[in-house]
């Protein structure tokens, strides 16, 4: 597998899937798709999004390589659609001290997808539009983008490296 160095602190751990021929079971993708996921290594470590279930194993290999023995402090969930969030519960089980960051609608959908017990309430960090999360030298600011695709979509702006 391959971890992609974005910067000294930001690594791409996503997976290219060249075996899929239809995106969302309807749109032809002759060269496949990319499931994007990132790790930010700082005083606190954050994982941005997971990947589709069909890419779990190579993604976990990339993640293990990128973390290099560290445990993640946060999983930031930008979007709950399965190609972005299929591994949320699995990752939460692998790292029981990791907190999960999302907005209120994110957790509503998460409970519907994985069950209300998948992510304990005390592990949830509910953010509002415009709020920030400091990782140390890097800060994530959350910007809501409802209905860009789904109602709970948000994006993260990393203020240090832009």
Model-identified regions with their sequence ranges:
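Conserved beta-strand hairpin/beta-sheet module of binuclear metal-dependent hydrolase folds
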Residues: 3-65, 155-158, 162
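Metallo-beta-lactamase
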Residues: 4-8, 102-153
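Short coil/turn connectors at secondary-structure junctions
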Residues: 43-44, 71, 96-97, 119-122, ...
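Structured beta->alpha junctions
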Residues: 44, 51-52, 80, 106, ...
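Short catalytic-loop micro-motif centered on adjacent basic/acidic residues
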Residues: 46-49, 73-77, 142
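Active-site metal-binding motif and surrounding structural segment of the metallo-beta-lactamase
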Residues: 54-101
């Amino acid at each position: 597998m391959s971890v992609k160095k974005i910067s000294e602190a930001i690594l791409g751990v996503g997976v290219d899937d060249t075996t899929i021929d239809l995106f969302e079971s309807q749109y032809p993708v002759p060269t496949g798709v990319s499931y994007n996921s990132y790790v930010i290594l700082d005083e606190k470590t954050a994982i941005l999004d997971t990947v589709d279930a069909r890419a779990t194993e190579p993604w976990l290999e990339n993640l293990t390589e990128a973390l290099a023995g560290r445990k993640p402090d946060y999983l930031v969930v930008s979007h709950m659609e399965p190609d972005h969030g299929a591994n949320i519960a699995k990752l939460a089980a692998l790292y029981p001290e990791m907190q999960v960051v999302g907005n209120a609608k994110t957790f509503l959908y998460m409970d519907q997808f994985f069950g209300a017990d998948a992510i304990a309430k005390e592990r949830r960090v509910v953010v509002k539009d415009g709020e920030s999360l400091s990782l140390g030298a890097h800060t994530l600011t959350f910007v809501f983008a409802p209905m860009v695709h789904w109602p709970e979509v948000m994006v993260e702006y990393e203020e240090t490296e832009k």
